[in-house]
UniProtKB/Swiss-Prot annotation:
The organism's place on the tree of life at top rank: Bacteria
UniProtKB keywords: ATP-binding, Nucleotide-binding, Transferase
Gene name of this polypeptide: mdcB
Record-linked NCBIfam families: malonate_mdcB (TIGR03132), PRK01237.1 (NF002315)
Organism: Azotobacter vinelandii (strain DJ / ATCC BAA-1303)
Protein name listed in UniProt: Probable 2-(5''-triphosphoribosyl)-3'-dephosphocoenzyme-A synthase
Length: 292
């Protein structure tokens, strides 16, 4: 038996990073109760999404994340050829996702964000602190992808133009400030305060929602929806967070307000997945490369 176990190959570095990315997406989807988002209770403000579809979509993205990490290891330079390679792989991953979901956009924003971060992590696996990985991802995001086919403006791009807000592209080019300054610090604070992991992750999501100019919310509900999201998320945290009785009441009020406006904070959900991915990279710090 021991000889058999010894022959089982360790997952490669690229496989580990792809596993972490898909795991972050699945854990984000499973987290409950998220205000107006798909979770274990139901579909939130969505009519075309459910938890089963979110799981299937996340698993369908594993080959794309794996290929991005492999590209980073083989090309080994943070330059335009790598940027264009992962852009192509991301588009292929999106096509696979849409085939699995029947055309429903479940994780387009997450492909962009986590694709950059998987690539950035694989480029320098000895330097996996969240700030280091996010800065490398930002440098990648700023590079032009000359192979990007012409497309009509997305919902997010139209929202950016209408309201003059930052979108997913700007968030990445800035090094994911919503995660580095808000999501990750709140996750750690809530853990340090004794919260269980579910409540710590909910608090991290709320910290992101409290400051993010979420283009998904703006698309569905305009500035009224954005104010509802930001003010409501802040109210939960001020009340003591999702683990407190007052915080749970405020969380319920937030959800009811968002549902009334048909607003779903999908951008914040993507950044929570980023938060969970970066958080899981830290235990890999200092580990021998062969052990990853």
């Amino acid at each position: 038996m021991s000889a058999f176990i010894a022959t089982i190959p360790r997952p490669s570095l690229a496989e580990r990073f792809a596993d972490l990315a898909v795991g972050a997406l699945i854990d984000e989807a499973e987290l409950s109760p998220k205000p107006a988002l798909v979770d274990r209770r139901g579909s939130g403000a969505h009519r075309d999404l459910d938890l089963k579809l979110m799981h299937a979509s996340a698993r369908a993205l594993w080959p794309a994340f794996h290929a991005m990490a492999e590209a980073a290891r083989s090309l080994a330079e943070l330059d335009r050829p790598l940027r264009e390679t992962i852009g192509r792989l991301g588009r292929e991953g999106e096509a696979r996702m849409l085939a699995v979901t029947g055309g429903v956009n479940t994780h387009r924003g997450a492909i962009w964000a986590l694709g950059l971060l998987v690539t950035a992590a694989a480029l320098e696996p000895q330097r996996l602190a969240p700030e280091q990985v996010s800065l490398r991802a930002a440098r990648l995001a700023r590079l032009e992808d000359r192979q990007m086919p012409a497309q009509p403006p997305s919902h997010g791009e139209r929202v950016r133009q209408r309201y003059g807000v930052r979108g997913a592209r700007e968030e990445a080019r800035g090094g994911f400030p919503g995660v580095i300054r808000h999501g990750l610090p709140q996750l750690r604070r809530s853990r340090a305060a004794g919260c269980d992991e579910n409540h710590a992750r909910l608090d991290a999501l709320l910290a992101i929602m409290a400051q993010l100019e979420d283009t998904c919310v703006l698309h569905r509900a305009g500035l009224e929806g954005l104010r509802c999201m930001q003010d409501g998320a802040r109210a939960v945290l001020v009340a003591g967070g999702s683990a407190s009785l007052a915080g749970r009441r405020s969380l319920r009020d937030l959800e009811l307000g968002l549902l009334e406006l048909n607003a779903s904070p999908g951008g914040a959900a993507d950044l929570l997945a980023v938060t969970l991915f970066l958080d899981r990279l830290e235990p890999m710090l200092g580990a021998p490369i062969g052990s990853l």
